[in-house]
Amino acid sequence: MNKKDKKKAPQKVAKVLHPLSRKAKKLTLEGIRDIKKEKNANIRKKEQKPIKQLLDHFQEIVKKENKKIFTESEVSDIIDQFLKTKTPEEEIKQVTSRTNKLEFTKSQHNDEIKEFKNNGYSVPDLTNANYVRFLLNWDGDMKYITQQSLPLKKFKYIEQPKNEMETDSK
C-alpha cells in the first residue's frame, strides 16, 4: 500500500454555534470589548500626542546640553525655542487639509505663546536633577510617564537683559 492510498483522517468541522447561546453571546461581548479597548487606546494616544512632542523636544535638548540641572531662565529659553519650532504651517502639513484648520492652529499657537508669557507653560521640571536623569533615560513610552515620575511645572517667560542678548549675537 502506498502512502497515497492511505486515507487521511477527516478534518474536524468547526462547530456551529447557535446565535442565542451563551457561548455566542460571550464571543460577541469579547469582540465588542476588544473594539472598545482599541478605540480608547487611540483616543489616549491622540490626547497624549502634544505632551509626547514636548517631552521628546526636552529630552533632545537635555541630551544635547548634557547638564544635570537647568536654571529657570534656561528652561524659559527652551520653552521659547519649542514654541518657535512648533509653527502652525508645519502642523497643518501633517494633518489632512481643511478650510478652517490653519486659522484654528494659528490661534491655538498664539494662545500657547500668550499663556507662556502671562501665566506660565507646563513643562517637565528640569530644575531637579532626578527628573533630568529620568528624562535622559526615558525610552519614549508614555505609559511610564506619571505625575510622580515626571511632574510638570509652570515656567513663565523670562526676558533676557539687553547686555546678554548683544553678547549672544556676536
UniProtKB/Swiss-Prot annotation:
Any Gene Ontology CC annotation: nucleus
Protein family: Belongs to the TMA16 family.
Name of the molecule in the record: Translation machinery-associated protein 16 homolog
Organism: Dictyostelium discoideum
